[in-house]
A protein has these predicted regions:
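Secondary-structure junction motif
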Residues: 226-228
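Glycine- and Gly-Pro-enriched alpha-helical subdomains that act as flexible
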Residues: 189, 196-218, 223
Length: 299
């Protein structure tokens, strides 16, 4: 595709070449930010992460992001070695070092640390965790609605790699994205184990039908913070919203479709599997929810 669009698409910003990055308690220039080739995150994708957005000097829903990070770390038996408060302070310290006040995105990554030998067993990670905070100027730039293609790949299952783990290991999602791109789309629409519409490779997925907002049950997708905020906004503003099973047939005939995620908030979908969704442009419900969300985060 020559006109590829991504849910994480942002304006080019030359300032990002000179950002300061937090690495294990030290703030260093981008060119000097490094981790060991023996790091368990590099070798095996053994770690968890969070993405957090800065709007007008405030990190949106930072407490919920910290809760999710620490819950995921506990689930994989990874001791972060810091409190939630100290991790938040590291985020604020990195923000100050970069002089950022708005339209910034932070990726906070924690791995099991440096291994003594290049093999799988977690006991080989004996140095303590590795933590990195990358913070970039990231004003979203979306020239058109997203095009999706349904792919055969699925998110992890609760008994394999639970999708609620924001894991460094994203190979299934990367393969899904590759398949979608080869099908002429921007990103992938992924079904659940029962064949119902679930999520995309990078975001949670919603449709609008006859004034109702639908999203998946949440059983097989990331427990998205922006997803939950949209559900809450619908309920607070008398917009019918349902977490339910629905099929591709339901999806193709939707009036609107949109994605939710920390980076892009609410991203319109214009086409799925070659079918135009609604008018192919951002619909009135998506626009309304974007407005309500902007008020919520103070954007």
């Amino acid at each position: 595709m020559t006109d590829h669009v991504s849910t994480h698409q942002a304006e080019d910003d030359a300032r990002n070449e000179k950002i300061q990055i937090w690495v294990n308690g030290r703030i260093v220039p981008k060119a000097e930010a490094m981790v060991s080739v023996y790091d368990s995150g590099f070798m095996l994708g053994d770690g968890v992460w969070e993405g957090i957005r800065l709007y007008n000097g405030r990190w949106s829903f930072v407490d919920e992001h910290m809760d999710r990070l620490f819950e995921a770390a506990k689930a994989i038996d990874l001791d972060i070695g810091m409190t939630k408060e100290s991790v938040t302070n590291a985020l604020l310290e990195t923000q100050k070092a970069n002089g950022m006040t708005n339209d910034a995105h932070a990726r906070l990554m924690v791995t099991r640390g440096v291994k003594t030998r290049p093999f799988q067993h977690p006991k080989l990670s004996q140095s303590g965790p590795t933590m990195v905070i990358i913070m970039e100027h990231s004003r979203q730039k979306l020239p058109r609605p997203i095009k999706l293609a349904t792919v055969p790949h699925m998110r992890g299952l609760p008994m394999t790699q639970d999708p609620k783990l924001n894991s460094h290991s994203k190979l299934n999602c990367i393969l899904a994205c590759i398949a979608a791109e080869k099908a002429g789309a921007d990103e992938a629409l992924m079904l659940d184990v029962h064949g119902f519409v679930n999520t995309t490779n990078a975001c949670n997925f919603f449709i609008v039908k006859k004034g109702q907002v639908w999203t998946s049950t949440g059983d097989y997708c990331m427990n998205g913070i922006t997803r939950q905020k949209v559900i809450d906004l619908c309920r607070a503003n008398d917009i019918p919203v349902f977490e339910r099973n629905f099929s591709l047939v339901d999806t193709y005939s939707a009036d609107e479709a949109f994605l939710t995620g920390t980076f892009g908030a609410q991203t319109p979908v214009g086409m799925i599997d070659g079918r135009v969704i609604g008018t192919g442009q951002m619909g009135p419900m998506t626009e309304r929810l974007r407005g309500l969300y902007k008020k919520l985060v103070g954007a």
